[in-house]
C-alpha cells in the first residue's frame, strides 16, 4: 500500500513539473520580449544597376593576366523589377561585362570595385546580385565595409554555372555591437551602417587559364528601415 501511495505522489509531482515547463515555454518572458519580438520593416532596395560607364573598376595582378570591363546591352530574363521600378524598364538596359586573359594557371584573383563606396541605409540583412557565369568553379565574394570602416568579405557562392543566376549572401549581425559587422552605434551619430566596396573572384587554379568572361547586373539589398520609417518628423538628425 505504501508503495502505491508513493508512486501516486511521484506521478502527481511529475505531472506538475511537466505543466510548469510547458507553461514557461508558452508564456512570454518579459525580459526577452524586447529582444525576441523587435519591430522590423524589411525592404528590398536597389543598390546599383550597372548602368553608368566608368563607375566600376577592375583589377588583377599584372603577373597573372590582363583584365578589362565594359557595359553591354542585356538583362536577366528572370529578374523581377522592384515595385518602385515598374514602368521604368527603359532605365535598366545595361550589364557590366568583365573579361580576364590569364597568363598561366595559378592561384589567381581579381576584383571588381565601385568607384565610390555604395552606402545602404538601415540595417542590411542580405545582399544579392545577378551573375552570368561560364561554368567554371571560381568563387565570388562581396567586399563590404561596416559602420566603423572595417573591411569584411562575404561569400556569395561558386561560379560553376552557365547563364544568369541570382547569388545571395547573408550579412551576419554583430553579437554585441562591437565585434563582427557593426551597422549602427548609439555613440557615433547617425549614418548609413554598411557600404559595398565591390567584389572579389578567387580563381580555381586548375581552370584559371585562357580567357574568362562574366557579367553583373542588379545589385540589391534587403534592409530593415524600421528606425528610419518611424522617425519623428520633428526630431533632429545627428549627421553634422
Where are these regions (language model features)?
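Bacterial N-terminal signal peptides
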Residues: 8-16
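Small/flexible residues
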Residues: 4-5, 202
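Beta-rich carbohydrate-recognition modules and glycan-binding surfaces
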Residues: 21-240
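Positively charged n-region of N-terminal signal peptides that target proteins for export
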Residues: 1-4, 21
Amino acid at each position: 500500500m505504501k508503495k502505491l501511495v508513493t508512486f501516486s505522489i511521484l506521478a502527481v509531482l511529475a505531472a506538475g513539473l511537466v505543466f510548469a515547463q510547458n507553461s514557461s515555454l508558452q508564456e512570454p518572458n518579459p525580459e526577452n520580449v524586447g529582444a525576441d519580438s523587435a519591430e522590423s520593416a524589411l525592404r528590398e532596395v536597389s543598390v546599383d544597376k550597372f548602368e553608368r560607364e566608368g563607375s566600376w573598376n577592375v583589377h588583377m595582378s599584372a603577373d597573372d593576366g590582363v583584365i578589362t570591363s565594359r557595359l553591354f546591352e542585356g538583362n536577366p530574363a528572370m529578374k523581377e523589377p522592384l515595385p518602385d521600378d515598374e514602368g521604368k524598364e527603359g532605365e535598366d538596359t545595361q550589364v557590366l561585362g568583365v573579361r580576364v586573359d590569364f597568363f598561366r594557371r595559378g592561384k589567381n584573383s581579381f576584383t571588381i570595385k565601385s568607384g565610390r563606396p555604395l552606402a545602404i541605409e538601415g540595417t542590411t540583412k542580405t545582399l544579392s546580385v545577378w551573375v552570368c557565369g561560364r561554368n567554371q568553379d571560381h568563387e565570388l565574394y562581396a567586399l563590404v565595409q561596416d559602420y566603423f570602416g572595417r573591411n569584411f568579405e562575404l561569400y556569395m557562392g561558386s561560379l560553376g554555372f552557365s547563364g544568369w543566376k541570382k547569388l545571395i549572401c547573408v550579412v551576419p549581425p554583430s553579437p554585441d555591437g562591437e565585434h563582427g559587422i557593426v551597422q549602427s552605434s548609439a555613440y557615433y551619430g547617425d549614418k548609413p551602417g554598411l557600404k559595398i566596396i565591390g567584389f572579389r573572384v578567387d580563381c580555381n587554379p586548375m581552370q584559371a587559364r585562357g580567357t574568362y568572361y562574366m557579367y553583373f547586373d542588379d545589385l540589391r539589398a534587403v534592409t530593415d528601415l524600421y528606425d528610419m520609417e518611424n522617425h519623428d518628423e520633428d526630431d533632429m538628425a545627428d549627421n553634422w
